Amino acid sequence: MDREFLDPSSLSSAPLLILPGAGDQFDFGAYATHWKIDGSQTGGRFAVVHHPLMPHTLGAPLHRHHREDEYSYVLTGTFGALLGDAVVTAQTGTWVFKPRGQWHTFWNAGDAPCEIIEVISPAGFENYWRELRTVWPDRN
């Protein structure tokens, strides 16, 4: 039997079905963050966010994480990334691993919208976008 949960933020250890469009979001304009699974729901083990990117949009400036690994799955479009010294282009269905400590940036490398699902482990970094939302409230 399928179970549907309209408010996944209220769950901590129950099975979880996240409906399309569910979850909080922050819109940067040509780039957005949609929270799908929060660290509070996984005991801090991981978080999952959805990032739609408009064509030729930079997703993040060059940066690195000291505690998180990131795994990006390309749902649609062409995903470009600088991973250390390597520039990669990933098409629909491709996973891109960005290990902690590695300098990286990413962008939509195509002429059509690109969407990625990002798994962040351990959880916590998903709160960065929540912090941005508080200092940039006109983007909510």
Question: At which residue positions do the language-model features occur?
Answer:
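Acidic/histidine-enriched, glycine/proline-rich intrinsically disordered or flexible terminal extensions
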Residues: 130-140
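Short acidic-glycine-tyrosine-enriched beta hairpin
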Residues: 26, 85-103
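Glycine- and acidic-residue-biased ligand/ion/polar-headgroup-sensing regions
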Residues: 67-79, 84
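Extreme N-terminal tail/first-helix region
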Residues: 1-35
